[in-house]
């Protein structure tokens, strides 16, 4: 899709960010913090999941981003692009071994794009994610070759990541975000793939994260997993990488079903690549199988389809890998499914 702003002007505006500052530790307040935080630079709402329709299996991903444009904040014009909204959507069709994806971008306002500050209600033209007063979510994202029309119902409490919702992302205090998850969402609805509709049921994971700064100057990207286990547990793990592949920072959490979450320390999570896939389009090499050691145990994460690379250079400017994967325990037994995200392999991630 063609951006609503000239690409060069957009990149120059985003490059004009001032120095970041450390986020204060604070108690997240709901439902207010389900909404947007336009005073901070970057924010996203992200839902991934696994769904079935008879013998057919699918993965799905939808993400809405909000980005503050600092270079325009003092402009008086009502047409100044002070906030941008981006959106990505994708379906992984396991039977046909293919990924369908789409992207959008627009300046906030004028009835085109919005991100409510009172609760989750983000939209970009006819793409929408809205939270109801009962706590459920409704996602409607029609695209050219596919469509998502899904409803999500929480089955567990909100999971505050890091230190009561303040999640460090690097060795310096300003490298942090406010971050919560809603794992084990019950998902129902309809997926349309190449004109064919499927009534589906499944399980999903929601992340909502907002920050003034995320990446240390040495970080080129990150690897992240959000896994819904079959027994109702939830596993989060991530690390940020330097250019040589070494870990700059790591973290995550483990929440058994019905129990309190346990946050992982910065040195307690280790990612080890076990198998790589090279994209025929970008020539980027992605580890599509990982061994991940955590305080909750050792796990293997294995992509269910190697080619789940997304080219979002028409919106956020990044090429990344985001895909449905399975989780195996230390004995090799499948124990859950979720999504693996890998950034910074095609080029250094800019945030």
How should these model regions be labeled?
Residues 1-15:
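N-terminal secretory signal peptides and thylakoid transit peptides that target proteins
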Residues 21-351:
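Structured soluble/peripheral alpha/beta segments that form catalytic or ligand/cofactor-binding pockets
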């Amino acid at each position: 899709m063609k951006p609503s702003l000239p690409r060069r002007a957009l990149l120059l505006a985003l490059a004009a960010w001032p120095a970041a500052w450390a986020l204060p530790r604070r108690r997240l307040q709901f439902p207010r913090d389900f909404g947007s935080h336009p005073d901070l630079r970057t924010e996203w709402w992200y839902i991934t999941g696994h769904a079935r329709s008879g013998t057919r299996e699918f993965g799905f991903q939808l993400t809405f981003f909000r980005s503050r444009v600092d270079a325009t904040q003092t402009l008086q014009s009502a047409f100044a692009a002070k906030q941008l909204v981006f959106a990505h959507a994708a379906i992984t069709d396991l039977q046909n071994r293919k990924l369908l994806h789409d992207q959008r971008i627009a300046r906030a306002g004028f009835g085109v794009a919005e991100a409510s500050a009172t609760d989750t209600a983000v939209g970009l033209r006819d793409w929408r994610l809205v939270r109801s007063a009962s706590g459920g979510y409704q996602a409607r994202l029609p695209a050219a070759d596919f469509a998502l029309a899904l409803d999500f119902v929480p089955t567990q409490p909100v999971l505050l990541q890091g230190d009561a919702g303040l999640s460090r992302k690097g060795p310096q205090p300003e490298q942090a975000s406010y971050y919560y998850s809603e794992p084990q969402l019950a998902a129902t609805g309809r997926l349309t793939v190449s004109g064919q509709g499927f009534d589906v049921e499944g399980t999903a994971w929601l992340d909502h994260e907002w920050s003034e700064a995320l990446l240390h100057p040495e970080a080129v990207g990150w690897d992240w997993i959000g896994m819904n286990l079959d027994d109702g547990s939830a596993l989060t793990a991530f690390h940020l990488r330097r250019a040589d592949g070494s870990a700059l920072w790591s973290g995550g959490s483990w929440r058994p079903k019905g129990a309190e979450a346990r946050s992982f320390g910065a040195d307690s999570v280790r990612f080890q690549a076990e198998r790589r896939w090279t994209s025929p389009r970008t020539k980027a090499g992605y580890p599509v199988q990982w061994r991940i050691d955590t305080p909750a145990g050792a796990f293997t994460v294995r992509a269910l389809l190697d080619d789940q690379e997304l080219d979002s250079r028409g919106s956020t400017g990044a090429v990344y890998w985001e895909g449905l994967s399975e989780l195996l325990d230390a004995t090799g037994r499948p124990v859950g499914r979720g999504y693996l995200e890998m950034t910074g392999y095609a080029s250094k991630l800019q945030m």
